[in-house]
Amino acid sequence: MSFLFKRNKGSAHKPTKPNFSKTSTTPSTSQLKHSHESNVKMSTSTVTEHRKKPTGSGSHITASPWSKLTVRGSSNVLPRYSHASHLYAEGGQEIYIFGGVASDSQPKNDLWVLNLATSQFTSLRSLGETPSPRLGHASILIGNAFIVFGGLTNHDVADRQDNSLYLLNTSSLVWQKANASGARPSGRYGHTISCLGSKICLFGGRLLDYYFNDLVCFDLNNLNTSDSRWELASVVNDPPPARAGHVAFTFSDKLYIFGGTDGANFFNDLWCYHPKQSAWSKVETFGVAPNPRAGHAASVVEGILYVFGGRASDGTFLNDLYAFRLSSKHWYKLSDLPFTPSPRSSHTLSCSGLTLVLIGGKQGKGASDSNVYMLDTSRFRLGSVPTTSGRQRNTSFFSNSTGNTNPSAFNGLLTSSRIPSYNGSKVRSTSHPSRQQYIGSSNSRFNTRHQTISTPVSGRASNDLPSPVVPTRSNSSSILQPSYNLNSHSSDRRNTNDDDQSSLNSQQLSNQAKAQGEVSPTLSFVPSSHSMEQGNGSVASANNAQSEAATRSINSISEVSEVRFPEQSSVKTVDERKSLDGRITSVTLETLVEKYSELSKQQIVEWFKSKLYEILRDSASKIDSLTEKLKVANAEKNAALCEAALEKVPLAKHNKLSDGTFSTPDKENVQSTNDAHIMQENFSLHKALEVMRETSSDLDKQLKDATASQKELIVQTSSFQKELVEERERHNAISKRLQEIESLYRDRELLVTNLEDQLVDQTVTINKFAFERDQFRERSMGFENTIKDLTRKMEATDMLNVSLHESLRSVQTENSELVTEMALLKAELVKKQAIIDANANIYDKLTADHTNYETVSADINQNLKETLDKLLNGSSDFKNNEIELLHDQIRITNAKLEKREKLINASKYIEDTLRSEIQEAAEKVSNLEFSNFNLKEENSNMQLQLMKALEQRNTGAKQLVNLRMQLSTATSELDMLKLKLRTTALALEESPDDYSDILSILRADMSPFHDLHKQCGVLIDTLNGVKRGFGIFEKKFTDYHKFLENISDKLKSEEDTSLETPIHENQSIQSDQIKEVGEVLSAIKSLSDSVMLLKNQIDDLAKEKLPLSSSDDEKVNIKEKTDFMKLLVKSGLSNPPAKEPVHDNEN
């Protein structure tokens, strides 16, 4: 579906004229003179005939710019308010109407089109995404796109407002919802939509009690694209105050807004938005600006803004019309226009050429209007005309160039004052004839026929201005009784009884009208040519004419009464009509108060006075004419009587002659002819007298009828005055009642204000809750969407995760086993570390003991040397003592050795306790490690454990290095001992007699040899333990390496290789660690081999036999010494015997 966004920029300034309008050429607006006075002059040189009908139908060309358009099918559309339309008709012919509140007080979403060419409403059945029922929305027509946004769409406060943009293709009648990315303006109502270039601009509006003043734009060129979005206009200065119910329009590529309300204040300011500068500015205006209002309608025609209606701050509906010239920034008030529509708000005003079309609107309670009104803007000329002061009407508004008042203008003036008007078929003069003119007129004025009553102006709807029955100038009293029917509303009435009774002539009436500053309505009747011709005839023809006029007037009154009062249509006689006059008058007076309560009472009183003056004036003129006729008839009668008296004298003479007096023949003939002539004249005079008597009797009857009718009129005037007095009393009572009602209303208003304040507080809280609920809904919707996406993804990944979960379960089980094994290995490593630490302590103790042994051995050697010297030099008596001393020393050394063994046992006990504590700590660590079930964490823990094992291996390696250094020192010392032994053997071979030196060397060197032998044994034991631990560790690592290889082989067959890389990395790291452990084990093996080799060498040295070349005794002694040394060496490897050897006893 494609839209053609064609915007005729000239349509707002140079509109095309519709087909139904025929307008003559008018001067351009540039030729008009502007004025600072707020007045208007209407051009009478141009008359636009909106709906031209035949003259026989009763329609008339009116001077009012307002007119009604008779539309077919309007009952289905109107009354309606808060609907949406567009400012300019499509092609000058069609106006689209959407939504609003109809007569059933329910929001609608129906679509109608008004065709101005055919004057018909047509319902359009649309398809697609039709907007929901709404009111207070905004719309605009651009090309073939009818665009709708916003409106009050929710039926509940908690519901969410619709903030979508809807587009209707007027060619295909298909609705489409615009897809806009990003943020959207919030739903609202009472806003406006305008077009600036290719963008539609949204301004203002309200949402419950919050009013907006943001300007949001939507580019139609980006419709249905990825760039389709709403953009908030960044304004450089402060925008207008927030408002709703305003009007907006574009002119010269600028956006204007006028009026509106923010709930508390009503505005009448005009603001302009400059899109190039992106700034707002308040327009300074001149002239009389409209009152602050909201809910009004406006449209622009040829650079002039027309504003109509709305609702004021006090809640009253308005029907005033204002014009604003955008070039001069001047306001004009177009006041006192006839046929102005009733007050209303929430209506629409569309432009079709030079004509504005008013549709719908909300009115007061009980008021409804189903009419479509049209305003012809070509009738206005915004020029300089002097204004009138006081209550004087601006008659120049309806005057032509010559200054003569035409009937339509006069009719319009009456309509503007809401007094019913009367039009004759031909009107020659609007001035009232004076009483002297009536007296000086001929008898033909008395013979005028009853004129035809004109239909209402323009012939639109007779129910708006019904024509009252006009009384004729007949002699019949029934004809002189008028029946009144007003189409105006009742208002204030003044007490004008003194004025009514003081002046009855036309001069006084005109003076009163001039004093009051008003032009009184007039009735002007023109006599027909037939009645004019018969006015010059005889008295008999005049009587016939009067009788004919009377019968026609009676028939006309009966016809009108049959239309007005159907129940009285059977009454056709004059007597029956007389009986109905009171009923008609009572009915019409009762309807005055009911139907026309809005008109001022002063205007009703003035209207009654004018009608009463007209009736009295007509009756006075009739009475004057009758008196003149009576005077003429009496004069003719007197003349005839005189002539008859004079004729009686020759008649008497003729009678005397006939009695007996005779004359000559000639004289007799002459006299006979004279008598015959006289007799003929007498006969004619007699007939004339009879006619005069008849006429005088008729005149007497007419005079009596006239006097009776005058009396009846006086009675009627008195009754009218009584009714006026009663009406004033009613008015006073009603005014008192109104005051009481106003006081009650004020109290109620206070209560209502309090309730409104409470309602406002409640609505604020409800709005907060609704806002929070909307946020919660949005968040929940987002959460639901994310959950749906996650469920979809989870469903997609479940199939993949099944196999992974199975493999992970197997891996986890195996990994748990590995973790347990690693924990055991770690515990064993901790134990080995503790053993190594204990061995280090023992080694330190051994070094300390070694130093002590060296000192003790030095002392013992020194003592042995001294004793040997003594033995050699001394006698044998001292040998036993010496031997005993040696035995004592040996015992002391054995005791010391036992102490040291106890210390070693204590260290072993401490080592066992430490091992148990380490085992408990290891069990705690294993329990903590079993809580980790994630594969990555377990791998990381394994890596950390391997790193710790490596650190421990490094520390063990360092200790091994230290042991190697100690072993190297021990080997060097062993080499030194070998050298010493070799030197001693060589010395014995060279000088076998020098036993003392050899013995001293042996005594001096046996203790360090014993110590070294003992250290080597301890070192061999520790190395064997370490070798066994590293063997177990190597076995475990080889098993673990095989397990990892099996896992890698399993994972290679599967597609997902997400776990291969870390396993390969772990495998490579562990293989490197295993290699390093293997190297350590090989080093330990080599070290143990070297130690074993050293031990074997020591044993070989111990087993070697030294050559002896001395005597037998000395050889025996040397042998005993060597055996003793062997025993010492054996005591270093194992516990020495507690008892002394046998050879000691022998010695």
Curated annotation (Swiss-Prot):
InterPro entries: Kelch-typ_b-propeller (IPR015915), Kelch_1 (IPR006652). It holds the Pfam family Kelch_4. Residues 502-512 have a biased composition (Low complexity). One of its GO terms (molecular function) is protein-membrane adaptor activity. GO terms for biological process: establishment or maintenance of bipolar cell polarity; protein localization to cell cortex of cell tip. Residues 18-32, 385-403, 408-465, 472-489, 519-547 have a biased composition (Polar residues). Residues 1-16 have a biased composition (Basic residues). The keyword Cytoplasm applies. Residues 1-64, 384-403, 408-547 are annotated as: Disordered. Residues 538-1147 are annotated as: Interaction with tea4. Kelch repeats lie at residues 94-144, 146-198, 199-253, 254-303, 305-351, 355-402. It is found in: Cytoplasm, Cytoskeleton. Keywords: Coiled coil, Cytoplasm, Cytoskeleton, Kelch repeat, Microtubule, Phosphoprotein, Repeat. Gene3D superfamilies: Kelch-type beta propeller. The modification Phosphoserine is found at S503. Residues 611-649, 716-838, 879-990, 1084-1105 form a coiled coil. Residues 948-1147 are annotated as: Retention at microtubule cell ends. The keyword Coiled coil applies. GO terms for cellular component: cell cortex of cell tip; cell division site; cell tip; cytoplasmic microtubule; cytoplasmic microtubule plus-end; division septum; growing cell tip; microtubule cytoskeleton. Major component of the tea1 cell-end complex. Interacts with rax2, tea4 and tip1. Interacts with for3 in the presence of tea4. Cell polarity protein. Acts as an end marker, directing the growth machinery to the cell poles. Involved in the regulation of microtubular organization, affecting the maintenance of a single central axis. Prevents the curling of microtubule tips around the cell ends and is required for the retention of polarity factors such as pom1, tip1 and tea2 at the cell ends, necessary for the cell to grow in a straight line. Links tip1 and tea4 in a common complex. This is Tip elongation aberrant protein 1. It comes from Schizosaccharomyces pombe (strain 972 / ATCC 24843) (Fission yeast).
